[in-house]
Swiss-Prot record:
InterPro entries: Class_I_gatase-like (IPR029062), CobQ/CobB/MinD/ParA_Nub-bd_dom (IPR002586), CobQ_GATase1 (IPR033949), CobQ_N (IPR047045), CobQ_synth (IPR004459), GATase_3 (IPR011698), P-loop_NTPase (IPR027417). This is Cobyric acid synthase. One of its GO terms (biological process) is cobalamin biosynthetic process. Catalyzes amidations at positions B, D, E, and G on adenosylcobyrinic A,C-diamide. NH(2) groups are provided by glutamine, and one molecule of ATP is hydrogenolyzed for each amidation. The active site is at C332, H431. Belongs to the CobB/CobQ family. CobQ subfamily. The gene is cobQ. Pathway: Cofactor biosynthesis; adenosylcobalamin biosynthesis. Residues 251-439 form the GATase cobBQ-type domain. PANTHER family: COBYRIC ACID SYNTHASE, DETHIOBIOTIN SYNTHETASE.
Length: 489
């Protein structure tokens, strides 16, 4: 049976450019007619996406699937860890919640996780011409090397060649590359076929002596120096993107708190990128600034994040905001916070118990063991009934009179969320609430912006994937990585 061409991208650090490089290479090969799939053995992220087979994977792999012209599938990210505390995480295997484990217990569970990884790998390499693999963090973390399934442990088991990427914009790129290589075992070093330097800006001629030294020092080629691509929009996996982009005159101010276990913050990308919206993240210790709209985003640990929000004094700021006529929206965990009570009888987010919500909507939420995972579409219960589409990822079941006025009507007939009688507060389980152009325009009008231009996030994402692929084709030596027939032309 045919076996796919495989290549693994590992990085010297987190955010070195692994996800971006895999997405860009996937788009390059997709445009050349190659049947290509992305793969990340193990991902740790609170931003996830719903798959075509009813599971969830990291958003980076969903973006890479889009770059490859595919629907997201759970095999693209067979092990997803969703941290719920500083020392524990929910373990998602093949798209479904398997169990929750402490970091120490997960170490003992790794052989089971590795079996799931290899099962997905075996399916992909027989179904596609090429599989592009993304590592996690750095392969040189000494304390994580035992039973590693995310980096060289996987590369060795699957016999996959590796390229190493480093971010020169951070500084120290040569130390990162040489140091990482030297911390690997001899067999692992032999897998590293070359280096990619990411996010370079300046005169390449001034960098060339360093590249020559690196090649002489390591005996491995620099496969390319990728430029810093200003304004590139690709879904962030964990790190919050800079929200304060340079804009002209804005029509609306939107703020959102950054709680410790914030999840799926990409829900707010459309607001962050909108030219007429002044969007701001509000971090710990910061006062909630005056705004037209406050958005409470999703959370992986709703009770803990709500307690933390109160400790910041933001509950009082939200009440003050509403008294002055401001609008408030809650998405998923943020929606659950708006009710009277949150119950966790099974201790799914820590200790079993209940906590009072903000009391702004007449409803209560109970966390249940079964997670709802579904792509959905429908209409918003706002003027003109704009279309909305997105996905549900939640373990909570909400009940109460507030739900008699749903914020959305799904195509299957279900109502979702709540819209307060005075129209000030909107809550929903729909992730991607702002992504549909018609829904975005309607929500901005509801928040007080009036008629504003729309932003097509999907079109922007596609255009930036092509811009990334164009840069890779210009600056990377693809002939050293892939068969000649894929590279010609």
């Amino acid at each position: 049976m045919p076996h796919a061409v495989a290549l693994m991208v590992q990085g010297t650090t987190s955010d070195a450019g692994k996800s971006t490089l895999v997405a860009g290479l996937a788009r390059v090969l997709f445009r050349r007619g190659v049947r290509i799939a992305p793969f990340k053995p193990q991902n740790m992220a609170l931003n996830s996406a719903v798959t075509v087979d009813g599971g969830e994977i990291g958003r980076a792999q969903a973006l890479q699937a889009l770059a490859a012209g595919l629907e997201p599938h759970s095999d693209f990210n067979p092990v997803l860890l969703k941290p719920s505390t500083d020392v524990g995480a929910q373990v998602v295997i093949h798209g479904r919640v398997a169990l929750s484990l402490s970091a120490r217990d997960y170490h003992a569970y790794k052989p089971t996780a590795m079996a799931a990884v290899m099962a997905s790998w075996d399916r992909l390499v027989t179904a596609y011409e090429c599989v592009l693999v993304e590592g996690a963090g750095s392969p040189a973390e000494i304390n994580l090397r035992d039973r590693d399934i995310a980096n060289m442990g996987f590369a060795e088991a699957a016999d996959v060649p590796v390229i190493l990427v480093a971010d020169i914009d951070r500084g120290g790129v040569f130390a990162h590359l040489v140091g990482t290589l030297e911390l690997l075992s001899p067999s692992e070093q032999a897998r590293v076929k070359g280096f990619v330097i990411n996010r370079f800006r300046g005169d390449l001629g001034l960098l060339q002596p360093g590249l020559d030294w690196l090649e002489a020092r390591t005996g491995r080629p620099v496969l390319g120096v990728l430029p810093y691509l200003h304004g590139l929009f690709l879904d962030a996996e964990d790190a919050l993107a800079d929200a304060r982009a340079e804009k002209g005159e804005t029509r609306l101010t939107v703020v959102a708190p950054v709680y410790p276990r914030i999840s799926n913050h990409t829900d707010l990308d459309a607001l962050r990128l909108h030219p007429q919206v002044d969007f701001r993240w509000v971090g710990p210790g910061q006062a909630m600034p005056p705004a037209d709209l406050i958005v409470l985003p999703g959370s992986k640990s709703v009770q803990a994040d709500l307690a933390w929000l109160r400790a910041q004094g933001w509950d009082a700021a939200i009440l003050r905001h509403l008294r002055y006529g401001g609008k408030l929206a809650g998405i998923c965990g943020g929606f659950q916070m708006l009710g009277g009570w949150l119950h966790d009888p099974l201790g799914l987010e820590g200790g079993a118990g209940s906590i009072a919500g903000l009391g702004l909507l007449d409803m209560e939420t109970t966390l249940a063991a079964e997670k709802r995972l579904e792509n959905v579409c429908g209409t918003l219960n706002l003027p003109r009934s704009p279309a909305a589409a997105g996905y549900e990822i939640h373990m909570g079941v909400s009940r109460g009179a507030a739900l008699d006025r749903p914020a959305l009507q799904f195509a299957d007939g279900r109502g979702d969320g709540a819209l307060s009688a005075d129209g000030q507060i909107l809550g929903t389980y729909l992730h991607g609430l702002f992504d549909t152009p018609a829904a975005l325009s309607a929500l901005l009008a509801w928040a007080g912006a009036g008629e504003v231009e729309s932003v097509d996030l999907a079109a922007r994402r596609e255009a930036d994937l092509d811009r990334l692929a164009d840069a890779i084709e210009r600056h990377l030596d693809l002939g050293r990585l892939f068969p000649a027939e894929w590279v010609r032309g």
